[in-house]
Amino acid sequence: MSEMTPPQIVSELNKFIIGQEQAKKAVAIALRNRWRRMQLNNELRHEITPKNILMIGPTGVGKTEIARRLAKLANSPFIKVEATKFTEVGYVGKEVDSIIRDLTDAAIKMIRVKNIEKNKLRVEEIVEERILDVLVPRPKNNWTENEKNESLLNTLQVFRKKLREGILDEKEIEINVLASTMGVEIMAPPGMEELTSQLQSLFQNLGGHKKNTRRLKIKDAVLLLKEEEAAKLINQEEIKKEAINAVEQNGIVFVDEIDKICKRRDSSGPDVSREGVQRDLLPLVEGCTVSTKYGMVKTDHILFIASGAFQTSTPSDLIPELQGRLPIKVELQPLTINDFEKILTEPTASITAQYKALMKTEGVCINFTKEGIRNIAEAAWKVNESMENIGARRLHTILEKLMEDISFNACDNVGKTIEINSEYVGKHLDQLISNEDLGRFIL
């Protein structure tokens, strides 16, 4: 778990997200409180539950990105789900319990990767020896012991050096590897994912541990053997135990579009896709135990971050019990021209930096001037104001249109420097922005 202080967390988020200081502050405190909780004794630790967060703001202002970056900083199991994908229990559709199952799957994958990385050097040594055993067969017994040892060691050293330098990558060898398990695709109705997963695991285990002899290039054999040897060094039970603990103590669930499951004020009668889903979500957020194929998972200390635009509803339209379980409410502000300008240049791997890097692979140098950046920001803001406001995502649409000709004719401009200035932006965008009907389809 991250031991970063709230100011450090906000500083790290600032590298990727512009503005929204209030939201960053709220998630930074929530993350730090997790670390604080882990420092307490067991009795008190169990009593302290996370303060879940509700982010309110239009699309494209950074709600999802804040949650995603937070999970990376915390090195925690993280999953993003759309509230609209779920239906009330008893109806056709995904049940909310699958959120925790998917989160546990993500944790298993995360812990497995961590374990493989930890054993990386050991695996490389084992694989190297297995390849050398094939390349340098053991000599016959009619050699004297001294001659055998000296000659074998010299030969091994020569082949080891060649192997490490990649000289033998294209050479083909025959190796014994575990037979691949039979691929069984099982179709199941929505909500039956758990049963499907168990049946697939059952069929995969039927193959046992049979070995096949395969003829492969050394570079391909190395990859295959690394997977095989890494799997041998991994303790599956330990991974399950560690993953379940990671989910229960550090898991983060981001529920997007929660406003879409609010019951409309003017509607009456049961609504499968709205209030019923909220009531099914409630036990997860309050704390319950969910059965997964890896074991039982308690949700008491999982952090839930919900978000929605709430354009046709308000947070008070959520059922009261769910409102109470999302005590921290943060409003994210619409993006201004200055925000767009900063988004284009300031974040790590900003959009303009990405385009520069892509064009550099073709030998084309792109230079965005300060005036050009300002014009792009103004164009994005104007289009958002006159049409649908999609926030920072509008910049991708605008830049893609700006770079269209450059990308298409990149091969003809090798070695050239192209300047994206005020004149260039005006030439390519002014007509589209002024003609609202045309812009609606293109931008």
UniProtKB/Swiss-Prot annotation:
Keywords (A to Z) from UniProt: ATP-binding, Chaperone, Cytoplasm, Nucleotide-binding
Cited SMART domains: AAA, ClpB_D2-small
Keyword check for Nucleotide-binding: yes
Signal peptide location: none
Molecular function GO terms recorded: ATP binding; ATP hydrolysis activity; peptidase activity; proteasome-activating activity
InterPro entries: AAA+_ATPase (IPR003593), ATP-dep_Clp_protease_ClpX (IPR050052), ATPase_AAA_core (IPR003959), Clp_ATPase_C (IPR019489), HslU (IPR004491), P-loop_NTPase (IPR027417)
Compartments it resides in: Cytoplasm
Gene Ontology BP terms: protein unfolding; proteolysis involved in protein catabolic process
Record: residues binding ATP: I18, G60, V61, G62, K63, T64, E65, D256, E321, R393
GO cellular component terms given for this protein: HslUV protease complex
CDD domains assigned to the protein according to its UniProt record, in alphabetical order: RecA-like_HslU
A Pfam family assignment: AAA_2
Subunit structure as annotated in this protein's UniProt entry: A double ring-shaped homohexamer of HslV is capped on each side by a ring-shaped HslU homohexamer. The assembly of the HslU/HslV complex is dependent on binding of ATP.
Function: ATPase subunit of a proteasome-like degradation complex; this subunit has chaperone activity. The binding of ATP and its subsequent hydrolysis by HslU are essential for unfolding of protein substrates subsequently hydrolyzed by HslV. HslU recognizes the N-terminal part of its protein substrates and unfolds these before they are guided to HslV for hydrolysis.
UniProt similarity note: Belongs to the ClpX chaperone family. HslU subfamily.
PANTHER family tied to this protein: ATP-DEPENDENT CLP PROTEASE ATP-BINDING SUBUNIT CLPX-LIKE, MITOCHONDRIAL-RELATED (PTHR48102), ATP-DEPENDENT PROTEASE ATPASE SUBUNIT HSLU (PTHR48102:SF3)
Protein name as catalogued: ATP-dependent protease ATPase subunit HslU
Naturally occurring in which organism (per UniProt): Buchnera aphidicola subsp. Schizaphis graminum (strain Sg)
Gene: hslU
